[in-house]
């Protein structure tokens, strides 16, 4: 069930990946329901996203960046550049063998590994060591 009471049917004739994120859990937690849709859902095509990521990765400044990623936004929220009024989303790449420097989130972060080899993980922790890496971290596979 979509937050505004709609129904969704998904089909594909080839390989497809779907990462569907919405505010329904938040609404359920708050004990509220929607009356009508307020904004339209967003769709980000693989081709467009990949083209943006490739452009960033091939830029000399992008090669030294902590993250090669694209902020996914909804045209309904130009000031916040968010997917919904409460949800941020980014799509990024991390080349094989590279380690992403630790960074902090001010809100919820969901990692979705689309393609990776066994052993790929997210390290979670509350302290950094003298080299700026996570001290006593927890691996989240």
Residue ranges and their predicted role:
Residues 1-4, 111-141:
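A short beta-strand-loop-beta hairpin characteristic of the jelly-roll/cupin
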Residues 2-32:
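Ligand-binding loop in jelly-roll beta-barrel domains
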Residues 11, 81, 99-105, 112:
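Short histidine-centered beta-strand/loop micro-motifs
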Residues 15, 28-90:
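A short, N-terminal "cap"/entry segment at the start of jelly-roll beta-barrel domains
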Residues 20-23, 93, 114:
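Short, structured patches in soluble enzyme cores that scaffold and shape functional sites
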Residues 27-28, 99-101, 119-120:
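Eukaryotic short linear interaction motifs
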Residues 77, 88-105:
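Conserved short histidine dyad/triad with adjacent acidic residue
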């Amino acid at each position: 069930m979509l937050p505004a009471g709609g129904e969704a049917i998904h089909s594909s004739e080839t390989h497809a990946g779907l990462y569907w994120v919405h505010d329904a859990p938040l609404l359920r937690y708050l004990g509220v329901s929607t009356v009508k849709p307020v904004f339209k859902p967003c769709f980000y095509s693989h081709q467009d996203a990949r083209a943006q990521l490739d452009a960033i990765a091939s830029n000399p400044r992008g090669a030294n960046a902590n993250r090669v990623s694209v902020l996914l936004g909804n045209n309904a929220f130009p000031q916040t550049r968010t997917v919904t009024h409460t949800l941020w989303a980014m799509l990024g790449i991390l080349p094989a063998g590279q380690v992403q420097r630790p960074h902090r989130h001010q809100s919820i972060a969901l990692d979705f590994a689309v393609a990776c080899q066994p052993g790929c993980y997210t390290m979670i922790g509350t302290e950094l060591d003298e080299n700026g890496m996570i001290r006593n971290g927890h691996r989240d596979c």
